[in-house]
Regions:
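Conserved small/polar residues in nucleotide/adenosyl-binding loops
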Residues: 212-219
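RNA-binding accessory domains that recognize and position tRNA/RNA substrates
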Residues: 1-178, 182-208
């Protein structure tokens, strides 16, 4: 494992080791306090462009499930069809994993998806810094390489457009009630929960200029 340093925009540094795809990266540093579910968190579109810090101390011990899909097109075990987080930052990465449904290790998955991962970080201390300072940018740099990547600048980046569906998608067609879902980065499990409640879900892109409800006969409201 190569030595890496997480450098926050206020100059604070945390030193660790690389276990994912080896490339420097910059982005907004955010924390996640979930005790499990790192495959779901990494594939959550709401984390697009962010360096995700996991506060739970041990990560990777149950591997990564396969990318399979349900008949309705939703991923079975993930929240979308790929990793959206720009990097993952953990305290202790377990190279050994064991789970009946595991297909590969977290490191193998990260490398395949070109996503950096670093371990050996005091993530709880890092979380305290982020909690007190608020939104903060950061970089993951390799100690044996010069810092040649710019600070993350999200001005002009439309993340909603990047994660939203491009076409209208229907789930559970013909159900008794219908829900229109404007996709600004929806997780698969939100759609699944709606389907399980017996409704048809019409998933539409985010980029409507206006949603207009026309007049109707009588008191249809």
């Amino acid at each position: 494992m190569r030595n890496v340093t997480l450098v926050l925009s206020d100059g604070t540094k945390f030193h660790g080791k690389s276990f994912g795809y080896e490339k420097p990266v910059a982005g907004e540093v955010v924390f996640n306090t979930a005790m499990m579910g790192y495959p779901e968190s990494l594939t959550d579109p709401s984390y697009a462009g962010q360096l995700m810090v996991l506060t739970f101390p041990l990560v990777g011990n149950y591997g990564v499930p396969p990318f399979s899909f349900e008949p309705n097109g939703l991923p079975t075990f993930m929240e979308s069809d790929r990793i959206y987080a720009s990097a993952i930052i953990v305290a202790d990465y377990s190279e050994q994993y064991s789970h009946w449904n595991a297909k590969e290790s977290l490191a193998e998955w990260l490398k395949r998806e070109h996503v950096p991962g670093i371990t050996g970080i005091d993530t709880r201390e890092l979380t305290k810094v982020l909690r007190e300072a608020g939104v903060m940018m950061g970089k993951i740099l390799f100690d044996d390489e010069p810092d040649n990547i710019p600070e993350a600048n999200y001005e002009g980046v439309n993340f909603v457009d990047l994660v939203s569906c491009k076409d209208i998608i229907k789930y559970n067609e013909g159900a008794g009630k219908r829900v229109v879902l404007v996709d600004c980065g929806v997780k698969a499990n939100i759609i699944r929960c709606l389907i399980n409640r017996g409704v048809e879900v019409v998933r539409v892109p985010w980029n409507y200029c206006l949603l207009y409800t026309s007049p109707s006969p009588r008191d249809s409201a």
